[in-house]
């Protein structure tokens, strides 16, 4: 029997449950089911949720649309964690409602950083030499 390793990714069940929880959180936030002035003023995206192996902890990566007011939004989500957990429990049929944690989604920042790197003069110079060779059918 194979032992799980540190590099092993989430199981198919973890991924499936994470997607259900993500949809439930996004639905609650988009419908405005939580009575919070900060949350009602922002459109919040939930691009990813990661589940613990025992499915008792869900880490939701969230970002207000436009990237504005991240700290107040995260604080509001933390304040409303219990109510949000109850709403998720109503929508997702699990033995235990997962405890919710909220983290800032950094994928957009990382993508922008990579884009800046690819557009840098040094990289363009390196790519320029390869593109000349690749574009020449006789080379």
Swiss-Prot record:
A single Gene Ontology biological process assigned to it is: maturation of SSU-rRNA
Which GO molecular-function terms appear in the entry?
Answer: ribosomal small subunit binding
Where is the protein localized?
A: Cytoplasm
Q: Which SUPFAM superfamilies match?
A: Ribosome-binding factor A, RbfA (SSF89919)
One Pfam family hit: RBFA
Q: Which domain of life is it from?
A: Bacteria
What are the entry keywords? Cytoplasm, Ribosome biogenesis
- The SS bond pairs are none
* One GO cellular component term: cytosol
Q: Which family does it belong to?
A: Belongs to the RbfA family.
What does this chain do?
A: One of several proteins that assist in the late maturation steps of the functional core of the 30S ribosomal subunit. Associates with free 30S ribosomal subunits (but not with 30S subunits that are part of 70S ribosomes or polysomes). Required for efficient processing of 16S rRNA. May interact with the 5'-terminal helix region of 16S rRNA.
> What assembly does the database describe for this protein?
Monomer. Binds 30S ribosomal subunits, but not 50S ribosomal subunits or 70S ribosomes.
The name this protein carries in UniProt is: Ribosome-binding factor A
Q: Origin organism of this chain?
A: Methylobacterium sp. (strain 4-46)
